[in-house]
């Protein structure tokens, strides 16, 4: 009897111990943090991306780029810091994303369509782009997919474009192409530009951001329908972070954040065209080095990015110190006599004085804008006022407010400026008629020149990298002695 009781007690103890163990194990498993909880606990959102003008790069003021700005807003939503990690190529990017303890997500202008997409998951899309076949101006233009046969083609290894070509090869077995993990989009466009390859495939947004550096490249045709860019997250069944990402992207689209970022980074990329791009590339090499030190000096004195000042100068005069217009404005920064006197400029044709005066005038205008206008919109408003005057700009802001738009956002106010040239609108304003449409183009052009200068002068683009890229970087390429300054008239 005693032995039986002891046996029962041992069994009960064993069952109790087993139950406690299973309970603890179950609690331990239940307490394993989700992907979202890990990010919040660490206080850091790790994001892997690519180094390119359409995604992420660093300039004098720090980190920037479309994907960087979007990821930064997402990190702010989560209440954590953003940590950017860069990948050498797409294969490296996806490898980092799939590795245990790797980044939380990839934000790199990705289009779903890779052959190994099963290893990752994609978010809702946030920007529509079109894959395009790129060729060199002067060569026979391909017009259909079968025209790719017999051409020297290179694309990014592991890209959706490589997957597209793999599908096309099933239809045309004789099609040949190379995939490379040692290049970026900039390199592929340069190779087409100089004739090292015949064709490449890139997305429309990548081309828009880079075409100005390579004026010989052209779009042959769209290679398929438009598709959306998305963020990539590691595979698995943990939806915590994915749900938060999708909610953020949906809200960003609904509340206008995506539109503002598109306007900032892509809203002004089509204003140059072939002739403008080719001419600007020449002037970067031949003219700007003569005046670069003056722009830098003014920028330092006025605590303003010298490249923005240089962009204004190019829009005004094409960096010609003797430029003159029919209205009497003169010099590299095209100052009126009244403005020159107010800024202490005694000789408008002296490039150093003109740059100092124009720069001082721009910064003064910017400082006088309402405090409710914040950067980067503040600089765009200042450019508009520099061109059209503060009074007319204020008319456009009031018009925007009456239309239910935001008078402190350039994206909204620029829609109103062309109305200042239409009687049914300007008749209701305080200051009357103005060529507001020209002002919109002025701001677009300056922004485009500024973007180019920002990219080609970023810190990592130095030395041999510049030579290899083929970009015309002021201060590096030598000025040609036979450069024609022109007759000084616009």
Curated annotation (Swiss-Prot):
Residues 1-32 form the signal peptide. Residues 467-490 are annotated as: Disordered. Residues 270-490 are annotated as: LT domain. SMART domains: PBPb. GO terms for biological process: cell wall macromolecule catabolic process; cell wall organization; peptidoglycan catabolic process. Residues 33-269 are annotated as: Non-LT domain. It is found in: Cell outer membrane. The active site is at residue 316. Keywords: Cell outer membrane, Cell wall biogenesis/degradation, Lyase, Membrane, Signal. GO terms for molecular function: peptidoglycan lytic transglycosylase activity. Its EC number is 4.2.2.n1. Murein-degrading enzyme that degrades murein glycan strands and insoluble, high-molecular weight murein sacculi, with the concomitant formation of a 1,6-anhydromuramoyl product. Lytic transglycosylases (LTs) play an integral role in the metabolism of the peptidoglycan (PG) sacculus. Their lytic action creates space within the PG sacculus to allow for its expansion as well as for the insertion of various structures such as secretion systems and flagella. In the N-terminal section; belongs to the bacterial solute-binding protein 3 family. In the C-terminal section; belongs to the transglycosylase Slt family. This is Membrane-bound lytic murein transglycosylase F. It comes from Pseudomonas paraeruginosa (strain DSM 24068 / PA7). The lineage of its organism: Bacteria, Pseudomonadati, Pseudomonadota, Gammaproteobacteria, Pseudomonadales.
């Amino acid at each position: 009897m005693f032995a039986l009781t002891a046996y029962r007690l041992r069994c009960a103890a064993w069952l109790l111990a087993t139950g406690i163990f299973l309970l603890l194990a179950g609690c331990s498993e239940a307490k394993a943090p989700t992907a979202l909880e890990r990010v919040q606990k660490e206080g850091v959102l790790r994001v892997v991306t690519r180094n390119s003008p359409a995604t992420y790069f660093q300039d004098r003021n720090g980190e920037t780029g479309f994907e960087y700005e979007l990821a930064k807003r997402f990190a702010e939503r989560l209440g954590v810091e953003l940590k950017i990690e860069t990948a050498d190529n797409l294969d490296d990017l996806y490898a980092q994303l799939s590795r245990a303890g790797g980044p939380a997500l990839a934000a790199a202008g990705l289009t779903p369509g890779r052959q190994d997409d099963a290893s990752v998951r994609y978010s809702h899309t946030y920007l529509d782009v079109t894959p395009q076949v790129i060729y060199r101006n002067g060569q026979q233009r391909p017009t259909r997919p079968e025209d790719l046969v017999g051409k020297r083609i290179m694309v990014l290894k592991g890209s959706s474009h490589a997957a597209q070509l793999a599908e096309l090869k099933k239809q045309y077995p004789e099609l040949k192409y190379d995939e490379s993990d040692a290049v970026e989009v900039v390199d592929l466009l340069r190779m087409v530009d100089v004739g090292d390859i015949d064709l490449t495939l890139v997305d429309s947004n990548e081309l828009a951001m880079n075409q100005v550096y390579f004026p010989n490249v052209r779009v042959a045709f769209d290679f398929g329908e438009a598709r959306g860019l998305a963020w990539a997250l590691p595979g698995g069944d943990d939806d915590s972070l994915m749900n938060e990402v999708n909610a953020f992207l949906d809200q960003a689209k609904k509340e206008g954040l995506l539109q503002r970022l598109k306007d900032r980074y892509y809203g002004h990329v089509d204003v140059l065209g072939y002739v403008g791009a080719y001419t600007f590339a020449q002037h970067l090499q031949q003219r700007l080095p003569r005046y670069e030190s003056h722009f830098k000096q003014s920028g330092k004195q006025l605590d303003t990015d010298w490249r923005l000042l240089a962009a204004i100068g190019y829009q005004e005069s094409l960096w010609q110190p003797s430029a003159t217009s029919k209205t009497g404005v003169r010099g590299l920064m095209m100052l009126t006599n009244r403005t020159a006197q107010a800024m202490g400029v005694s000789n408008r044709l002296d490039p150093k004085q003109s740059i100092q005066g124009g720069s001082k005038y721009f910064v003064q205008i910017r400082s006088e804008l309402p405090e409710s206008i914040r950067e980067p919109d503040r600089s765009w408003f200042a450019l508009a006022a520099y061109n059209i005057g503060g009074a007319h700009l204020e008319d456009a802001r009031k018009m925007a407010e009456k239309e239910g738009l935001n008078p402190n956002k350039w994206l909204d106010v620029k829609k109103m400026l062309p109305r200042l040239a239409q009687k049914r609108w300007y008749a209701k304003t305080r200051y009357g008629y103005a060529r507001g449409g020209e002002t919109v183009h002025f701001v677009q052009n300056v922004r485009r020149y500024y973007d180019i200068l920002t990219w080609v002068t970023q810190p990592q683009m130095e030395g041999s990298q510049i030579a290899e890229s083929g970009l015309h970087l002021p201060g590096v390429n030598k000025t040609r002695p036979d450069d024609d300054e022109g007759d000084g008239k616009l």
